[in-house]
């Protein structure tokens, strides 16, 4: 996991539940919400 994704993880968890699990990194990269 890149440092950029690691930095954005807390923001994503606050914005929406971690329903995608480890795939959250891919969501950050694509800018899409799989929820």
From Swiss-Prot:
Linked residues for Cyclopeptide (Phe-Pro): 11-18
Tissues with expression: Expressed in basidiocarps.
Post-translational modification: Processed by the macrocyclase-peptidase enzyme POPB to yield a toxic cyclic octapeptide. POPB first removes 10 residues from the N-terminus. Conformational trapping of the remaining peptide forces the enzyme to release this intermediate rather than proceed to macrocyclization. The enzyme rebinds the remaining peptide in a different conformation and catalyzes macrocyclization of the N-terminal 8 residues.
Record keywords: Toxin
Similarity field: Belongs to the MSDIN fungal toxin family.
The protein's role, per its UniProt record: Probable toxin that belongs to the MSDIN-like toxin family responsible for a large number of food poisoning cases and deaths.
Listed name of the protein: MSDIN-like toxin proprotein 8
Classification of source organism: Eukaryota, Fungi, Dikarya, Basidiomycota, Agaricomycotina
């Amino acid at each position: 996991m890149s440092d950029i994704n690691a930095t954005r993880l807390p923001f994503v968890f606050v914005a929406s539940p971690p329903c995608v699990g480890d795939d959250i990194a891919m969501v950050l990269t694509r800018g899409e919400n799989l929820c």
